A protein has these predicted regions:
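Short, mixed-charge low-complexity intrinsically disordered segments
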Residues: 2, 38-91
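A short, exposed loop/beta-hairpin motif centered on an aromatic-Gly-Thr core
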Residues: 18-33
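Short aromatic-glycine-(Arg/Gly/Cys) micro-motifs in beta-strand/loop hairpins
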Residues: 2-22
């Protein structure tokens, strides 16, 4: 396999607006009132990077983005900037 080839794992995730999501356990969602399904792509070749993998979703209550954190494998939505998102995810 070529070293430059990127391996990818894809997870199906159900997440609630504003919540932190663990794609490894899929927990924290039994109380959700608004749920959305999304695809989370985990790029093994980028262990410390975070990038947005889904475009914004316009709803009656605002704009949302999905981000992947390959180091911690966590996802959140309802944030305007990557900086804000990084500040919210700690450890």
């Amino acid at each position: 396999m070529n070293k430059q080839t990127q391996t990818m794992q894809i997870y199906q995730v159900i997440f609630q607006r504003g919540d932190y999501v663990s794609v490894e356990t899929y927990k924290e969602f039994e109380y959700a009132t608004e749920q959305y399904e999304g695809i989370v792509k985990i790029w093994k070749s980028k262990p410390n990077e975070c990038e947005f993998i889904k475009e914004r979703h316009e709803r009656e209550f605002g704009y949302f983005r999905v981000a992947e954190f390959t180091n911690g494998v966590k996802v959140t939505i309802k944030t305007d900037t990557l900086r804000e998102l990084k500040n919210r995810i700690k450890g």
